[in-house]
Amino acid sequence: MNKNLLVFGFLIFVKIGETSKKFPLRAFVASTDIDNDTAHAIIEMLRLAEMTFNALSDVDFDVLLGTRDLPPMEMATMMWNLNRIICDEMKLGYMLMLAGTNFKNYGIYEDIANHMKMPLIDWEPSKSENIGKTTENNPMIFSVAPSAEQLLIDYIQYKGWRDVVYIHDGKNADRTLRTMFSYLHEKSPKYQLFVDNYVAPSDEEMFKEFLNEFHRRISTQHTLKSNDSSEEIDEPIPVNVIVDLEGSYRTRAFLRALEESVLVKKEYHYVFSNFDVDETDLSGFHFSLINITIFRIFDKNNKKFLKTRAEFHDVYRGGFSNTDSIPTAAAFAHDAILVAGKALQIAMNEHGKGIFDKSFVRHQLFNRGRKGLYCRPHEDQTESRQFETFEHGKKIAEAIKKVVLTDKDGTLTGRIQFDKVTGKRTNFSAEIVEIKPGVNSLNSIWERFQWAEGEGFLLGGERYVQEKKKDSSQTRKGILPSKPWQLRFNVVTVLVKPFVMLKRRNPGEPELKGNDRFEGYCIDLLNLLAKNITGFEYDVFISDGNKYGSRQADGSWDGMIGYLLNETADVAVAPLTITQERERAVDFSKPFMTTGISIMIKKPEKQEFNIFSFMEPLGMTIWIFTLSSYFGVSLTIFLVSWFSPYEKRIEFKRGEFTVTNEFTLYNSLWFTLAAFMQQGTDILPRAVSGRIASSCWWFFTLIIVSSYTANLAAFLTLERMTPPIESVEDLANQNKILYGVNEGGSTAAFFEDSIVPLYKKMWNFMVSTTQKQIELEKQSITNSTSNRIFVSSYADGIEKVRTSKGKYAFLLEETTNNYESGRRPCDTMKVGQNLNTLGYGIATKIGNPLRVSLNLAILYLSEKGELKKLENKWWYDRGQCDTGTSDGGTSSSLNLSKVAGIFYILLAGMVLSMCTALVEFLFRKNKENREKERNRMRSSRPLKPGILASCERAKQKQLQNRRTKSEEVSTPRSTLF
């Protein structure tokens, strides 16, 4: 039993060892100061290809890719520095080198590959000087990128050109021309071709000046020829220009300069000989007077290409936002990894699966039994080493020669096969795309040629005019329309108020058909476009599921974008947001409307007034401080009046002179209250100190009463509806109100892709809330999805806002938000500013020349104010709600509910006054009764004679004192105390 277990465990160990083989590769990626984005794109595509190959089920090993970034190097030190970097990497060991060579560094790679017998797979075209297959070329370098010399010659012969202008970088001209003429002589010995050479500037900023001078020189030459010729030349002399520049950056810079160049005429025909130009780069030439031809090696309709493109743009979002393609160099680098993996597999099949087992131990290369591989043996200090080449180099190189890959194997650039003598790519195919824009872009002619090496142009070239039928998958070939645009366009849209809506049919009216079924902003826009574009006729249909279009996991698109890509529709006219992701899939016109993401909430109920609403113009803190000030000032006036001698008075009362002070505590409170209520009193301070205190109190009451009056007038006559949130920050920083978006739309993509912390926080909240709701639904018997915050359409989101009693906010475009807020039942509103700025555009398939005419028509309508009129018509002129004042409230007259409190206070004051009067009356009555009772008791008590005489004398003395004081007061010297 134990023996069987040991054997079983050993077999498992062996199997794991077999499936865990990792063969290292090394990629050297050079970056430049001006085009660092391409280097990053190449690295990402290399990693993507590594994962693609390692995921294959029929391969029992993995490739382990290591990348080495090569910084910009000076020409003088490049040989030493690059040689040192490659040899240092070789000490660690790898099975294959991958690189993108150029004319500056090709010789270094060539020397190392030959010297060390280390195969190199190059993702740039071959720079070898050998031309014919009879001469043995370097068997260690293989170029995945094909050379275009044969394609150029075939194209020149197809066009029948005898004179061409060749614009190049200088270093590649001799090799390219020798290859072209060698192939031409082999194919057509009697065909004569004259080439005029021009060297392009090394600085891309000088391209425009170079082209202007070039066009001026060509124009001068043609003028001189016309003057020297005895016959009149009715037609201009054609100028056929071949542009052969190194790298996509320089090629695209040349295109931009050509677009801005002057003196260019319709007789010019520019041919770009590399594969770095895409159809989207030609959008600026639809209305130019020149012809442009490009070579394309991608099949954009291939599912593998679409999937890889989607994965690439997921991991790398820089530098290539204006194209739906992949950088050509990055695509060739991707295929180079597949070639390397396939070659290793072939070598193992031919020489045994264990051929490389002894070469790598613990990720260290052992070459011929010695650790590492040294370009310079003396650098190994640990042992005496002789120079030795890579022992498996020739076997791997021979395996590369046997590699045959197609798009079924995952390649992006079609069939890959190498010439066994030259190492160049052979038996490849390409597509030639030629644009001949006319004055009316709707009649622009495109020519497409399918070309295969050794066979030439398939079917003799395929010429067609971009016309659309109801079955848009068919294309009329070889003819021009007899009349402009007699065929109709298929326009796809979605039902979104007020852009596109179904017309209401009144009872008794016939059933609506065709375009008459719809109304709305977009329908009116289509009518205006039809009036301004000759022959523009259309049929409108609704997108299945009312979907705008989002990219699927396999790289395909649904919704309106999907209809455009599969050519079921020609144009998409709807509130379709222009986004970076959609721009890669389709072409957009100029925006016909600008909007942004906004917040929709349920309109709060009108503010209810309580009986103490009159106190709300001032905050509670102000009321407390005012009341405290009242008592404080009253006490202050009382104290300063008590201590100030100038506030005292002498009064004659009951026959006596007494010193009195009118500002008792009771009178001080009354005086201060009267001043606060803007009323007068019969007492005023006489002392300076009392007047200072009173003046400050009067100033205080003036400001308080004036402010209160102003706020009270606005407060009581304005009905405010205070929203629970006023900005996106308020929404994100609370958890009582849920919020969501339309699932799969551009708004959801905005939050998902945003790098703004606030928006990332909101997206994470929406996702986590949805997951919690799904878990609750799984546990629920009803399994209802009505509580989910993500909705399938705008209509569902708006309805959710209306039925959630203020507990749900919907994030949507401002246009729809404003429209719904102005429609019955008038219970929604927009809050806060827009989160971003978006544009709605008309979408067409990439390369459709109709886009240019749409752009011109939209700009014309915008300048004439027609687009603004449409907006006013559908948003404001047909509004059903009272918009009210701009500050969020509506002005109205006072009603009892707003001022009921003051009536209650008045009534309470009157009742309190009467109650107080009653208490005072009872108190006084009781006091008088007690006084009468006391006097009665005194009068009834008999007095002794001695006591009676004493009382009489005291009374006489008191009268005498009063007379004396009266005489003193009447004298001139009498003064106040």
From Swiss-Prot:
Record: glycosylation sites: N36, N227, N291, N427, N532, N566, N783, N895
Record's keyword terms, sorted: Cell membrane, Glycoprotein, Ion channel, Ion transport, Ligand-gated ion channel, Membrane, Postsynaptic cell membrane, Receptor, Signal, Synapse, Transmembrane, Transmembrane helix, Transport
Classification via Pfam families: ANF_receptor, Lig_chan, Lig_chan-Glu_bd
Membrane topology: Multi-pass membrane protein
Summary of the tissues where the protein is detected: Command interneurons of the locomotory control circuit (AIA, AIB, AVA, AVD, AVE, PVC, RIA, RIG and RIR) and motor neurons (AVG, M1, RMDD and RMDV).
Signal peptide: 1-19
InterPro entries in alphabetical order: ANF_lig-bd_rcpt (IPR001828), Glu/Gly-bd (IPR019594), Iono_Glu_rcpt_met (IPR001508), Ionotropic_Glu_rcpt (IPR015683), Iontro_rcpt_C (IPR001320), Peripla_BP_I (IPR028082)
Extracellular side: 20-621, 717-898
Main localization category: membrane
A GO CC term assigned to this protein in UniProt: postsynaptic density membrane
Molecular-function GO terms, alphabetical: glutamate receptor activity; transmitter-gated monoatomic ion channel activity involved in regulation of postsynaptic membrane potential
Cytoplasmic topological segments: 643-695, 920-977
GO-annotated biological processes: modulation of chemical synaptic transmission; synaptic transmission, glutamatergic
Annotated localization: Membrane; Postsynaptic cell membrane
Residues annotated as transmembrane: 622-642, 696-716, 899-919
Stretch list, region Disordered: 954-977
Role of this protein: L-glutamate acts as an excitatory neurotransmitter at many synapses in the central nervous system. The postsynaptic actions of glutamate are mediated by a variety of receptors that are named according to their selective agonists. Required for response to mechanical and osmotic stimuli.
Annotated PANTHER family: IONOTROPIC GLUTAMATE RECEPTOR (PTHR18966)
Similarity remark: Belongs to the glutamate-gated ion channel (TC 1.A.10.1) family.
Name of the protein this chain belongs to: Glutamate receptor 2
Species, as recorded: Caenorhabditis elegans
Name of encoding gene: glr-2
